[in-house]
Amino acid sequence: GDFFMATRVGMVSLGCPKNQVDAEHMLYDLRKEGFQIVSDAALSDVVIINTCGFIESAKQEAIDTILEFCTLKQEGRIKAVIATGCLAERYRDEMKKEIPELDAVVGIGSNGKICDIIREILLDKQAVCSYGAKTELSMEGGRIISTEPFYAYIKIAEGCSNNCTYCAIPSIRGKYRSRRMEDIVKEARWLAENGVTELVVVAQDTTRYGEDIYGKSMLPELLTALCEIDGFKWIRTLYCYPERITDELLDVIAKEDKLVKYLDMPIQHCDKTILKRMNRHGDRETLTALIKKIREKIPNVTLRTTLITGFPGETKEQFEELCEFVKEIRFERLGCFAYSPEEGTPAEKFEDQVPLKDRERRAEIIMEEQMIISDSLNEAALDSEVEVVCEGFDRYAECYYGRSQADAPEIDGKIFFLSEDKVRVGEYVKVKIDDTMDYDLIGSKM
C-alpha cells in the first residue's frame, strides 16, 4: 500500500458543473484510498482530465488539455495521464488510437474504479480502457468540494431522456435517472454543515426530477425540503425545461425565501418548425405566455436562457423572428451558441445545414442585441441596493467582487464594490449600485 501513498494526483475538470460534481466524487475516493490530491495538476504524478464532449469548441479544449499534459509526461515531469468524462465516454475507441500517450480512457460508468485504474497503470504500465454500464447512479459517497467554499453544486439526477435532435448527451450519459430524495437531502445537509451557504441544484433537466422513480415531477417537494436545512441562504436551480415549469414550481420559488428569484430556462429557439425539428415543444406564443406567467408569479425574477442559431433549415426569416423575440422578451441573462453538428445525432444528418459563417454571424447578432438589453437593464439598476456575496478581492481593480441573487456562479456577471471595512470571502453584504460596465455592475458597500 505504501507504494501509492506518495502518489500525487491532480484533476483538471472541464465543462459543466455536472461534470465537476463527478470530479469531486473521484477526488474523494482517491483521497480515501490514500492518494495525495494536489491543486496544481502540473505538479502531480498522475493527471486526470475530466473532459467535456458537448460541442466542437469543448472537444477541442479537452484535446488540447490532454496533449499539453502528455507533453509533460514525455518530458518526464508526470507519470501518467488519464481521460475521464464525456469525451472519454463518447469517443472511447478513437481516443486511445488518436492519443496513444494516454494511459487510461475511463468512461462515465467506471468513475468508481478510478483508484484501481491508477494502481494498475502505475504497476504494469499497460494502458487501460474501462467502461461500465450507465445505469447506476455514481453520486453516493463523499466529495471534495472544488468550488469556492461558500457555494456548491448538488446533482439531483444523471442522464437525459429529452432526446433533442442536436444533442449527444443522452447517448453519452444514458437515460434520465433521479437520485432518491433522502440521499439528496442528506448530501445537502452535509454541504451546509461544511459551510456552504449557496446551493446550486443541477441535472441535465432539473424539472424532470423524480418522474422516473416517484411517477411525477418532485422538484417542488425537493426544493421545499432543501429550504428546511439550516445554513443555506440561497438555493438556486439551473437547467429547467420550459414545458415542465409548472405553476406548482413557480409558486414554491415565489414563496420560499431561500429560493433565489432566478430561473434558468434554455429555450433554444422560438420558431415552431425549428423547435419541432429539435424534438422540442412550443412556439413563440406558448413561450411568451409562459414567460409572462413566470414574471407575474415571481416579481423581479431574473430569467436566463440559451439559444441556438443556424440550426439546420433555419431561414433568414426564422432567424429574424428570433431576434424580434429576444427584443420583445428582454431576458435578463442570455447565452447564444452557433449550432454545432454532433456525430451520431439526428440533426447532423439533416439535409439543409446552414453554413458555419452564417451560424456564427447570427449568434453574434443575437449577442449584440442582448448587449443593448443588458445595458438598459443595468442602467435601471443604478442607485438600487442589492445583497452581494463576496467572492474575493481584485488586486488589479483594487476592490472586492461578488454576485447577487441574480447571478449564477461561473456563468453570469459580477458586481465590483468598494468597502472601507474588510469583507470576508463568502460574506453577504449590502451594496449600492453606482455604475455599470458591460455585463458587470460597480457599487459600494453600505
Residue positions per predicted region:
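Conserved, mostly hydrophobic/aromatic
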Residues: I184, V201, T237, M265, ...
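Terminal RNA-binding accessory module
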Residues: K349-M446
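Contiguous mid-protein beta-loop-alpha structural module that forms a pocket-lining wall or clamp
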Residues: E314, E321, I329-F331
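Short, hinge-like loop/turn segments at secondary-structure boundaries
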Residues: I99-P100, I121-D124, S217-L219, I253-K255, ...
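Conserved SAM/AdoMet-binding glycine-rich loop
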Residues: A80-G85, R90, E193-E317
